[in-house]
Amino acid sequence: MGSLKEIKVRIASIRSTQKITAAMKMVSSAKFHHAQTQTEHTLTYANKLSAILNGLLSAECDLDSPYTEQRKVSKVAIAVFASSTGLCGTFNANIWKELSATIQTYKNQQIEVGLYPIGKKIADELHKAGYSFDTDFVTIGEKPSYESAVSLANRLMELFVTGKADRVELLYHHFKNMATQVVTHKTYLPLSLSDTEAAETATDYILEPSAEELRNRLFPKLLNLTIYTILLDTSTAEHAARMMAMQTANDNANDLIQQLTLQYNKTRQQAITNELLDIMGGAAVSS
């Protein structure tokens, strides 16, 4: 059992840390609500665009394009989304675990893997593990923007169209609710419209200027929006995870303060009791 002074110092230290975690939770809360609103708006637009393309597909329009070409897979590119800062629980660890398993699976199948990390934490893990990776997009998730999403999407589309990758995959966290961020692994290219929102009803379309022109414009736009939505979704999930981590830290601090306060009171009571016994013992001797 520590001295009264030691216990008081520990309580003061924990309360100081608690103020920091509370401030970080408030900052993450503001960023979370902003990212969530942006995600919802962008996702609505992306889903509507997907529905239009599915409607064209159901009307038997010719939507074949370089982005839908199915090939034998010998080279895979993986864009993996994480955070650039810590203190967000198991957020980055879960992504790294899934990525490590995926890389090993492809190694066993003798499939070449190209890595495109978004987030300093996942880039650090890849570096420590000795993997080579593209460093051009590591920081674009810190302040998600449509322009940065387009730059990444263009790189991934170029890899696929030029045959440098036979499949492009995305690995990220999808925000489900405050307590749950789901690790999601999906194929980005070749584009499969059957994986997107289906149109409610089949409709006869009159296409102007042409199906080819629509393909050339809508497919890249959908692929750009997909990356942008994932950047925002990852940001939303990250801030939600950090809020939960800071809340857990705050709760643990409260529990520890209660335990130390109880220990302080017991120690103080014991010290007072000992002093009284010494006084009573001295009085008995003098009498």
Swiss-Prot record:
- Membrane topology of the entry: Peripheral membrane protein
Question: Which Gene3D superfamilies did the record assign?
Answer: 3.40.1380.10, ATP synthase, gamma subunit, helix hairpin domain (1.10.287.80)
| Subcellular location(s) per record | Cell inner membrane
Q: Does the keyword Flavoprotein apply?
A: no
The entry's cellular-component GO terms read:
plasma membrane; proton-transporting ATP synthase complex
Keyword set includes Isomerase: no
Reported function:
Produces ATP from ADP in the presence of a proton gradient across the membrane. The gamma chain is believed to be important in regulating ATPase activity and the flow of protons through the CF(0) complex.
Protein name according to UniProt: ATP synthase gamma chain
Q: Name one GO molecular function term.
A: proton-transporting ATP synthase activity, rotational mechanism
Quaternary data: F-type ATPases have 2 components, CF(1) - the catalytic core - and CF(0) - the membrane proton channel. CF(1) has five subunits: alpha(3), beta(3), gamma(1), delta(1), epsilon(1). CF(0) has three main subunits: a, b and c.
- Pfam families in the record: ATP-synt
Organism of provenance: Parabacteroides distasonis (strain ATCC 8503 / DSM 20701 / CIP 104284 / JCM 5825 / NCTC 11152)
Query: Which family is this protein grouped under?
Result: Belongs to the ATPase gamma chain family.
Query: What gene name does this entry carry?
Result: atpG
List keywords of the entry alphabetically: ATP synthesis, Cell inner membrane, Cell membrane, CF(1), Hydrogen ion transport, Ion transport, Membrane, Transport
The GO biological-process annotations, alphabetized, read as: proton motive force-driven plasma membrane ATP synthesis
